[in-house]
């Protein structure tokens, strides 16, 4: 048995939903010509909700409230929407082999699905402790967070140990956001990671110090520079303590693991070119095969801003944009230019929120107030007298736009000391100039009227401010 489609989207995450909406708006298919194949049993949804609003103790986000594409303040794509738009959802279905040459996919049920164009949106999977030689990591109170099933388990485990002790393994995105959620659920948290500070791939030590101090004020304990080696368990097999490399035992009613992800490339290894741990694509999101595209976490694509250097970006904003771009390239290849993406990352925890744009390479110039309870601080990364990256905590919409603009423009820096002195004003003034390449004018007086107010400023994508700034602010 088998079915044939013109367009197949393999994977049911964020990228799949945004690709589907782009197809529908461009009218690039007839009813029954487009399908999404997903191992999950629900239509594509906004994954950021899982580590934010989904974990709230009260008023938690639940489906259908966060199906794509509400993350961009756009349409809510429920199963009904896909049916009305002639898009077939093949849910709860695992593809076990892919034959790029024959343009076929074989499912676990034995069905063969053929395609003319394939968009690989398989995303990435969470790394598991057993991959690092840690046995016993299948205990019922050990949680990961990558999909809806993971989130449901995490919620249930949290409910089972009110006021208990949680050990969070990992100091990156998932570790930090889950730690905040655990605290909100009145669970005591200890974070363990091997690096010298949290968010080590992005944060400078100075930036990390602020967030670690803030978390500490909320009751979080940090254990840095060491790793988990084993567990102690009770007679039922539940973890009761975490044993570290230095021999320390940490009491644990639950464990949350966030030690990174790995792109889901397995079906296509040996068939498509790989780079940066993902599937290599060009500026049209096209792989080494002329009928196969890759988007989201699984895609390694050229960043124009970095002179065409290939990068694989693990963030929802990249998933949304690359998905839309691939559909445009499929339907209107002659009109679609190479993607020109500004790398963008954001997070929000407690009353804090930050955004980062560009590349964190070069000399770091910090600015702003790192001591205020309602902070507004940041950093520039400068290389060869040009702004290469920018970070801002607690900014307004206009201020986030300003730092993104100076990164995209690669604004010229004449004097590092003056850049540090002017701080955010440099970005604001540069953004107001007509010329794309203005230098830092020494002694220039700030002319910008500050719009930010104290309190919670939610993180937002420049392309999709509605995600946090829409008429009805969503709590995820």
UniProtKB/Swiss-Prot annotation:
It comes from the Eukaryota. It catalyses: 2 monodehydro-L-ascorbate radical + NADH + H(+) = 2 L-ascorbate + NAD(+). The keyword Disulfide bond does not apply. Residues 1-3, 469-476 are cytoplasmic. Its cofactor is FAD. L-ascorbate binds at residues 320, 348. FAD binds at residues 12-15, 40, 47, 52, 146-147, 297, 316, 346. Its main location: membrane. Its EC number is 1.6.5.4. It is a multi-pass membrane protein. NAD(+) binds at residues 171-177, 195, 201, 260, 314-315, 346. NADP(+) binds at residues 173-177, 201, 260, 314-315, 346. Induction: Down-regulated during senescence. It is found in: Peroxisome membrane. The keyword Cytoplasm does not apply. Keywords: FAD, Flavoprotein, Membrane, NAD, NADP, Oxidoreductase, Peroxisome, Redox-active center, Transmembrane, Transmembrane helix. InterPro entries: FAD-oxidoreductase/Apoptosis (IPR050446), FAD/NAD-bd_sf (IPR036188), FAD/NAD-binding_dom (IPR023753), FAD/NAD-linked_Rdtase_dimer_sf (IPR016156), MDHAR3-like_C (IPR048618). Pfam families: MDHAR3-like_C, Pyr_redox_2. Residues 25-447 are peroxisomal. GO terms for cellular component: cytoplasm; peroxisomal membrane. The chain crosses the membrane at residues 4-24, 448-468. One of its GO terms (molecular function) is monodehydroascorbate reductase (NADH) activity. Catalyzes the conversion of monodehydroascorbate to ascorbate, oxidizing NADH in the process. Ascorbate is a major antioxidant against reactive oxygen species (ROS) and nitric oxide (NO). Belongs to the FAD-dependent oxidoreductase family. This is Monodehydroascorbate reductase 2, peroxisomal. It comes from Oryza sativa subsp. japonica (Rice). The lineage of its organism: Eukaryota, Viridiplantae, Streptophyta, Embryophyta, Tracheophyta.
């Amino acid at each position: 048995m088998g079915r044939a489609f013109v367009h197949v989207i393999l994977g049911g995450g964020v990228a799949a939903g945004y690709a589907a909406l782009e197809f529908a708006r461009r009218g690039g298919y007839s009813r029954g010509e487009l399908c999404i194949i997903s191992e999950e049993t629900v239509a594509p949804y906004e994954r950021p909700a899982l580590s934010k609003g989904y974990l709230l103790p009260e008023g938690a986000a639940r489906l259908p409230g966060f199906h794509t594409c509400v993350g961009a303040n756009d349409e809510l794509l429920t199963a009904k929407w896909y049916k009305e738009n002639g898009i077939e959802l093949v849910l709860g279905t695992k593809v076990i082999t892919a034959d790029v040459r024959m343009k076929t996919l074989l499912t676990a049920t034995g069905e063969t699905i053929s395609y003319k164009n394939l968009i690989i949106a398989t995303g990435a999977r969470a790394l598991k402790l057993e991959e690092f030689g840690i046995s016993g990591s299948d205990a019922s109170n050990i949680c990961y967070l990558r999909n809806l099933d993971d989130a449901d388990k995490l919620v249930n485990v949290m409910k089972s140990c009110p006021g208990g002790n949680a050990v969070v393994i990992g100091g990156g995105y998932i570790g930090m956001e889950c730690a905040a959620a655990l605290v909100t659920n009145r669970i005591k948290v200890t974070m363990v990671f091997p690096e010298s500070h949290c968010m080590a791939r992005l944060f400078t030590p100075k930036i990390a110090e602020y967030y670690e101090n803030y978390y500490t004020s909320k009751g979080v304990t940090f254990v840095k520079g060491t790793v988990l080696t084993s567990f102690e368990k009770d007679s039922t097999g539940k973890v009761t303590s975490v044993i570290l490399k230095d021999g320390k035992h940490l009491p644990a009613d639950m464990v949350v693991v966030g030690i990174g992800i790995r792109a889901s490339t397995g079906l296509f290894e040996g068939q498509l070119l790989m780079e940066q741990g993902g599937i290599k694509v060009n500026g049209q999101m096209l792989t080494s095969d002329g009928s196969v595209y890759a988007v989201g976490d699984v895609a390694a694509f050229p960043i124009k801003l970095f002179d065409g250097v290939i990068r694989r970006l693990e963030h929802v904003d990249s998933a949304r944009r690359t998905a839309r771009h691939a559909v445009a390239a499929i339907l209107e290849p002659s009109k679609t230019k190479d993607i020109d993406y500004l790398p963008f990352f954001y997070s929000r925890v407690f009353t804090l929120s930050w955004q980062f744009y560009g590349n964190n390479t070069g000399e770091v110039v910090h600015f702003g107030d790192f001591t205020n309870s309602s902070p507004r601080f940041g950093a520039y990364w400068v290389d060869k007298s040009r702004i290469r990256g920018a970070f801002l905590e607690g900014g307004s919409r206009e201020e986030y736009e300003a730092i993104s603009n100076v990164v995209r423009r690669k604004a010229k820096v004449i004097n590092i000391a003056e850049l540090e002195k002017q701080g955010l004003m440099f970005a604001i003034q540069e953004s107001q100039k007509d010329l794309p390449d203005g230098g830092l004018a020494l002694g220039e007086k700030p002319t910008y009227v500050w719009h930010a107010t104290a309190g919670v400023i939610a993180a937002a994508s420049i392309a999709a401010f509605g995600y946090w700034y829409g008429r009805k602010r969503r709590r995820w």
